[in-house]
Amino acid sequence: MDKIVIKGGNKLTGEVKVEGAKNAVLPILTASLLASDKPSKLVNVPALSDVETINNVLTTLNADVTYKKDENAVVVDATKTLNEEAPYEYVSKMRASILVMGPLLARLGHAIVALPGGCAIGSRPIEQHIKGFEALGAEIHLENGNIYANAKDGLKGTSIHLDFPSVGATQNIIMAASLAKGKTLIENAAKEPEIVDLANYINEMGGRITGAGTDTITINGVESLHGVEHAIIPDRIEAGTLLIAGAITRGDIFVRGAIKEHMASLVYKLEEMGVELDYQEDGIRVRAEGELQPVDIKTLPHPGFPTDMQSQMMALLLTANGHKVVTETVFENRFMHVAEFKRMNANINVEGRSAKLEGKSQLQGAQVKATDLRAAAALILAGLVADGKTSVTELTHLDRGYVDLHGKLKQLGADIERIND
């Protein structure tokens, strides 16, 4: 069993580079199934276990996938006739596998996708995906743990109003509608930078999508799409995690690839706390010293504070004086890391969807386990400043979303090792 062991107390200094965005590359890999002419080459692809999982799903669908890890590139050739079924064996490992349904419906007019697995955070229902596909003309039914979708007369453009700005549903509907007949309007669409990256990719392939990054997206269906080369945007969640690593240790680091516009709600909160940020063309420099100010945070869909940064921000808030409240509105069950923080002597009380942090916690090293992907990073951040040794287990969560996080922190001066027991 792998574990990461951290001895707290070292100030981080130096420069670190952000990988390509996990939450952009997964939908873009599935969108490569839309290209019936020429392969696509994706660059700046992070070497993550989730990327390998989605590549396996694409392979079962009869796409040829070449993963060039040394180049951080993946080539997807989906020009052959695709299989209609994405089996449970792979889909069960990761929720993002549901994103093959839109491209399969668009290309084949039918699809069978196992109900997804993956992250432990809340129920993450897929009703919005199904609502979108049905609006486009597909008949959907659930049977034996599979979603069966059939659009025997083809997909037809329509207007779809999402009940909630779901990222996955927005992506799936964009992909399905890109080859539908006529115009599709998605209202109350998700606005994340990863949505914009997906739309840009499909447009480069010959698609006609406007409005990505706003709450109304228009997709004019086209006859066919072709493969292209596309660079994945930097990972704003990894960038935010690294900015907090600099701030929590009261260090001075340059995070190359961090883009302010992709993480405005986070950087404004950091500045409110007294963290010094220097925005440069190719990244952000973070510096902090002394006491930080207390702030409250409330997670919201983009451009609000990202739920994927909630646990890391909580780690930083533990090192600030005063009363702080963290409110989680996006996912249920996203305070599972609190029990692990408490093992490190954190002063936190959870009441419903809010966690109350009283005063500056004198964090102590402890044995803790990651409960989900972002909690894994948050526990490592807390370990950077805890007194003594912290040991973090259940690292399969971490490997789903971070490339060599311990190595990057070590390069910046952390006393950190990954050990295989």
UniProtKB/Swiss-Prot annotation:
GO CC list: cytoplasm
Q: Name one GO molecular function term.
A: UDP-N-acetylglucosamine 1-carboxyvinyltransferase activity
Ordered alphabetically, the record's keywords are:
Cell cycle, Cell division, Cell shape, Cell wall biogenesis/degradation, Cytoplasm, Peptidoglycan synthesis, Pyruvate, Transferase
Q: Which GO terms describe its biological process?
A: cell division; cell wall organization; peptidoglycan biosynthetic process; regulation of cell shape; UDP-N-acetylgalactosamine biosynthetic process
Locate the residues binding UDP-N-acetyl-alpha-D-glucosamine.
95, 124-128, 308, 330
The record's top EC class is transferase
What residues form the membrane-spanning segments?
Answer: none
Q: What is its EC number?
A: 2.5.1.7
Q: Which Pfam families match?
A: EPSP_synthase
Listed under catalytic activity are:
phosphoenolpyruvate + UDP-N-acetyl-alpha-D-glucosamine = UDP-N-acetyl-3-O-(1-carboxyvinyl)-alpha-D-glucosamine + phosphate
- Xref: InterPro entries: Enolpyruvate_Tfrase_dom, Enolpyruvate_Tfrase_sf, MurA_subfamily, RNA3'P_cycl/enolpyr_Trfase_a/b, UDP_GlcNAc_COvinyl_MurA
The residues listed in the UniProt record as binding phosphoenolpyruvate, with positions renumbered to this chain, are 22-23
Q: Where is the active site?
A: 119 (proton donor)
> Which residues are recorded with the post-translational modification 2-(S-cysteinyl)pyruvic acid O-phosphothioketal?
119
Where is this protein localized, as stated in its record? Cytoplasm
Pathway membership: Cell wall biogenesis; peptidoglycan biosynthesis
Q: What does this protein do?
A: Cell wall formation. Adds enolpyruvyl to UDP-N-acetylglucosamine.
Q: Which HAMAP family match?
A: MurA
Please give the family membership noted in the entry. Answer: Belongs to the EPSP synthase family. MurA subfamily.
Q: What is this protein called?
A: UDP-N-acetylglucosamine 1-carboxyvinyltransferase 1
**Organism per entry:** Staphylococcus aureus (strain N315)
Gene from which the chain derives: murA1
